[in-house]
């Protein structure tokens, strides 16, 4: 999965096999999940 570091704004690749989640560039622990660029439309009820 691709995340963005909240501190240095670098794109970080995270695997499930990693022990803990940290930015590989600055060591910060807060990562933001990247959203897809496609817009998903849902019909109204």
Swiss-Prot record:
Cysteine-cysteine disulfides: none
Keyword Cell division: no
Keywords per UniProt: Cytoplasm, DNA-directed RNA polymerase, Metal-binding, Nucleotidyltransferase, Transcription, Transferase, Zinc
Gene3D superfamilies noted in UniProt: RNA polymerase ii, chain L
Protein location: Cytoplasm
Pfam families xrefs: Zn_ribbon_RPAB4 (PF03604)
GO CC annotation: cytoplasm; DNA-directed RNA polymerase complex
E.C. code: 2.7.7.6
Cofactor(s) named in the record: Zn(2+)
GO molecular function per UniProt: DNA binding; DNA-directed RNA polymerase activity; zinc ion binding
GO terms (BP aspect): DNA-templated transcription
Cofactor binding note of this UniProt entry: Binds 1 zinc ion.
InterPro entries linked: RNAP_P/RPABC4, RPABC4/Spt4, Rpo12
Reactions this protein catalyses: RNA(n) + a ribonucleoside 5'-triphosphate = RNA(n+1) + diphosphate
Annotated residues for binding of Zn(2+): 8, 23, 26
SUBUNIT field: Part of the RNA polymerase complex.
Similarity comment: Belongs to the archaeal Rpo12/eukaryotic RPC10 RNA polymerase subunit family.
Role according to the record: DNA-dependent RNA polymerase (RNAP) catalyzes the transcription of DNA into RNA using the four ribonucleoside triphosphates as substrates.
The protein's name in its UniProt record: DNA-directed RNA polymerase subunit Rpo12
Organism: Methanocella arvoryzae (strain DSM 22066 / NBRC 105507 / MRE50)
Taxonomy of the source species: Archaea, Methanobacteriati, Methanobacteriota, Stenosarchaea group, Methanomicrobia
Gene that encodes it: rpo12
